[in-house]
């Protein structure tokens, strides 16, 4: 099985890190410019340009791919199925115009010129809003085009908006909200190995916002402890040899840990230990 991941850029390291955390450790010594073996002899990682990964999967060069939704949509490939939002690389594809222009809405671009690295998404967007524009594909420095009279506006990726502000561009509309996705072809989405990879990556994401709590509690306080814990399916309770205390374990949301610990102490729990969870298969 072959997994296509970005070979460089802001998505490269997070993609590799996610695979490592999921247990698909990359084997040292492989030609990491093109591909890498993993500890699973049936799984190989292929490195490709983020924009090319949808085609790799669609053409059968890879079984699954990891890249941004913006790249999948721009590829305009019909037989790709999204398996999972991998929850990183979040950004927006926006329509923007110079701050000093009179453009306030998308309709002000009628018969105008738009520069973008995403011509297919851009044309579909303007078709949807029924505005006639001339779309020019560029391969970089999109933000400069309105200032050198190449375009009246741009459609480009932004994460924080800083680059747009630096180039005196204002957002007119949001075209697409994007993040990194795991996807496959329709005919391989139900493949057992594909499902295993999907489950492994999902287990990392599920664990990210959870914490594992362990504590001791008097038996007569158990009901109160259970009431406090917002755990998954109730806590695990075990006897402690030679003690009248019980060991209570539970998985809780990370954002609830602070208040939960305080409440647990109030009802008699002690020796509370909080640990991170590497993976959680729900």
Curated annotation (Swiss-Prot):
Any matching Pfam family: HisG_C
TM annotation in the entry: none
GO BP annotations, alphabetical order: L-histidine biosynthetic process
PROSITE patterns, sorted: ATP_P_PHORIBOSYLTR (PS01316)
Required cofactor names: Mg(2+)
InterPro entries: ATP-PRT_HisG_long, ATP_PRibTrfase_cat, ATP_PRibTrfase_CS, ATP_PRibTrfase_HisG, HisG_C, N-reg_PII-like_a/b, N-reg_PII/ATP_PRibTrfase_C
Description of how activity is regulated: Feedback inhibited by histidine.
Family: Belongs to the ATP phosphoribosyltransferase family. Long subfamily.
UniProt name for this protein: ATP phosphoribosyltransferase
